[in-house]
UniProtKB/Swiss-Prot annotation:
GO terms for biological process: protein folding. PROSITE patterns: GRPE (PS01071). Homodimer. It comes from the Bacteria. It comes from Francisella tularensis subsp. holarctica (strain LVS). The lineage of its organism: Bacteria, Pseudomonadati, Pseudomonadota, Gammaproteobacteria, Thiotrichales. The gene is grpE. Belongs to the GrpE family. Pfam families: GrpE. Keywords: Chaperone, Cytoplasm, Stress response. This is Protein GrpE. It is found in: Cytoplasm. One of its GO terms (cellular component) is cytosol. Participates actively in the response to hyperosmotic and heat shock by preventing the aggregation of stress-denatured proteins, in association with DnaK and GrpE. It is the nucleotide exchange factor for DnaK and may function as a thermosensor. Unfolded proteins bind initially to DnaJ; upon interaction with the DnaJ-bound protein, DnaK hydrolyzes its bound ATP, resulting in the formation of a stable complex. GrpE releases ADP from DnaK; ATP binding to DnaK triggers the release of the substrate protein, thus completing the reaction cycle. The keyword Chaperone applies.
Length: 195
């Protein structure tokens, strides 16, 4: 007999053995089922159903948690985008404040010559335009003269006695403060009354 014929014979005998093993396993499984009473089968089915229901509940719980997590992430992202929009110009606003300060200092001086008076009016209009642009972009001016001192909004540069005012009243403003959408960009530098 050739090698190929031997191989074919061996394969056929293996197939017959495998088929016999499968048939034996099926018979023993069906025999085992027949041996179980209807009550036992029902009990096993109930146990299986209970396990499946528990798994289903667990998956529902995990799905709800994942949904809540996604909602929290979405809200956090919206808040971050909103803050980026609101406070994105904060650095720009801080850099403009010294310009406003310089213009305001220049406007405090008395001017007598007609040309200088016209120049002062031009500077006043420029300052007003600059302040209006800042207001349009959410930058608010803090000029707290006469208000109560608030360390969150004001920086005390000096204290003076003055019986006409209550303690912690802002008597004078060295430098105005500014807020951007409710956040302090620069605290107002003030003189407060301390009797």
């Amino acid at each position: 007999m050739s090698k190929q014929e031997k191989s074919n014979v061996e394969d056929k005998s293996l197939d017959i053995e495998t088929a016999a093993q499968v048939e034996t396993a099926q018979e023993s499984a069906s025999g085992a089922l027949e041996e179980l009473s209807v009550e036992e089968q029902l009990e096993r089915a109930k146990d299986t159903i209970k396990e499946l229901e528990d798994s289903c509940d667990q998956f529902k719980d995990e799905a709800l948690r994942a949904k809540a997590e996604m909602e929290n992430i979405r809200k956090r992202a919206e808040r971050d985008v909103s803050n980026a929009r609101k406070f994105g110009i904060e650095k720009f606003a801080k850099e403009l404040l010294p310009v406003i300060d310089s213009i305001e200092q220049a406007l405090k001086h008395e001017v007598k010559l007609e040309e200088a008076i016209a120049m002062k009016e031009g500077i006043e209009l420029t300052a007003k335009m600059l302040v209006d642009i800042l207001k349009k972009n959410g930058v608010e001016e803090l000029d707290p003269k006469g208000e109560k001192f608030d360390p969150n909004l004001h920086e005390a540069m000096a204290m003076i006695p003055n019986p006409e005012f209550e303690d912690n009243t802002i008597f004078d403003v060295f430098q105005k403060g500014y807020m951007l959408n409710g956040r302090i960009v620069r605290a107002a530098k003030v003189v407060i009354v301390k009797n």
